[in-house]
C-alpha cells in the first residue's frame, strides 16, 4: 500500500475540524492504512479557534501535521504549502468542510495502484450550490477552454485532486508563480491521468469563504495565467478599427455627413481601447508580481514537522 499524504486547507473552519478528523479516523480504520499516512492541515491565517483545535488534534496523533501561516495567503497558497511539505507517495488535496467525500479516498488509491499519477475529481452535482453558481462554474470552464491553448480543463473539476510524489516534485520545482491556478497546473502537467466523479455534499458546518469578488479575481487571474488571447484582442480590434476608419473616410469623400454616427463609432472604439488598456494592465500586474519574487507563503509555526522544502 502506498503512503498517503492528505492536505487540508483551513481558514476559519472551527465548526468542522473535529468532524473531519473523526470522519477520517473511521475511514482510515476501514482502509487499514495504519500509520502509513499523514494528515497535513494548513492553517491559512485563521482568526477563529481553528489553530487551537488543530494543536489538540496534533498532540493526540503524531501523524497529524500542522503548518500555520503568518497571515492569510489564500487557498491556493495553502494547498501549495501542503504539497511542499508532503512526504507521501500519493498526495490528496481536499477541503475541511466534508464537501469532498472521504469515501473517495479508496477509489483514488485504487487508481494509483493501476499506475495513474494524476486524479482529477469532477463534481457531478453540488448539493450546497444554487443554480446560478452551477451555471457560472460551467461557464467559467468553457471560457477558459475556449481561450486557452495551453490546457483543457475538465468541466466541474475542483480543488479536490490527487497526485503522485513525482508530480509533486514537478510542482515544487517548476510551478512557483505568484498568480496561481493549481487545478490548472495539475491538469496541464502531463503524466498518466484520469478522472473520478463525486457528488459534493452539504458543508458539515460554517459558511463558504468565497465571495463574489474573490471568485471574479480568481477567474481573471486564471485567464491571464493560461491564455494570451486577450492580448491578441488588440491586434484584432486594431484591424477592425482600421477598416472602419477607411470606410468612414470613403463615406466622407462621397458626401456622407452624419457626424452623430461617426461620433458614436468613435465612442465605441475609445471604450474598446480603454478595455484593452485594462487587459494589458492585468498582464503587467502579473509580470510585476513575478519580478518582485515575494514568497508564496510564510510559515509561522509547524507541529509534528517532517518534510520541508
Language model features: what each stretch is:
Residues 1-130, 308:
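Structured catalytic core of nucleotide-sugar glycosyltransferases
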Residues 65-67, 154, 194:
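Structural signal for short hydrophobic segments within the conserved structured cores
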Residues 183-309:
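Hydrophobic helical membrane-anchoring modules
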Residues 69-71, 75-85, 102-180, 202-216, ...:
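Acceptor/aglycone-binding surface of glycosyltransferases and processive sugar-polymer synthases
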Residues 9, 27-31, 42, 111, ...:
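Histidine kinase transmitter module recognition
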Amino acid at each position: 500500500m502506498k503512503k498517503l499524504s492528505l492536505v487540508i486547507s483551513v481558514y476559519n473552519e472551527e465548526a468542522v475540524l473535529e468532524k473531519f478528523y473523526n470522519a477520517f479516523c473511521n475511514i482510515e480504520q476501514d482502509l487499514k492504512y495504519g500509520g502509513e499516512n499523514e494528515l497535513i492541515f494548513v492553517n491559512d491565517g485563521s482568526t477563529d479557534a481553528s489553530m487551537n483545535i488543530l494543536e489538540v488534534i496534533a498532540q493526540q496523533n503524531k501523524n497529524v501535521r500542522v503548518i500555520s501561516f503568518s497571515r492569510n495567503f489564500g487557498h491556493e497558497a495553502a494547498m501549495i504549502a501542503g504539497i511542499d511539505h508532503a512526504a507521501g507517495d500519493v498526495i490528496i488535496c481536499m477541503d475541511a468542510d466534508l464537501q469532498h467525500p472521504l469515501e473517495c479516498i479508496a477509489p483514488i488509491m485504487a487508481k494509483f495502484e493501476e499506475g495513474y499519477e494524476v486524479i482529477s475529481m469532477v463534481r457531478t452535482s453540488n448539493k450546497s450550490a444554487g443554480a446560478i453558481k452551477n451555471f457560472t462554474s460551467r461557464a467559467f470552464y468553457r471560457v477558459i477552454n475556449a481561450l486557452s491553448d495551453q490546457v483543457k480543463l475538465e468541466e466541474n473539476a475542483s480543488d479536490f485532486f490527487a497526485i503522485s510524489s513525482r508530480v509533486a516534485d514537478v510542482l515544487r520545482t517548476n510551478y512557483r508563480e505568484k498568480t496561481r491556478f493549481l487545478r490548472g497546473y495539475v491538469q496541464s502537467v502531463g503524466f498518466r491521468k484520469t478522472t473520478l466523479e463525486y457528488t459534493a455534499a452539504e458543508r458539515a458546518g460554517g459558511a463558504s469563504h468565497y465571495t463574489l469578488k474573490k471568485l471574479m479575481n480568481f477567474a481573471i487571474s486564471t485567464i491571464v495565467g493560461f491564455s494570451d488571447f486577450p492580448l491578441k484582442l488588440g491586434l484584432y480590434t486594431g484591424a477592425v478599427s482600421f477598416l472602419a476608419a477607411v470606410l468612414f473616410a470613403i463615406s466622407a469623400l462621397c458626401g456622407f455627413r452624419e457626424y452623430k454616427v461617426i461620433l458614436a463609432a468613435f465612442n465605441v472604439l475609445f471604450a474598446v481601447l480603454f478595455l484593452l488598456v485594462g487587459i494589458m494592465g492585468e498582464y503587467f500586474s502579473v509580470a510585476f508580481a513575478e519580478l518582485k519574487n515575494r514568497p508564496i507563503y510564510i510559515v509561522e509555526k509547524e507541529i509534528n514537522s517532517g518534510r520541508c522544502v
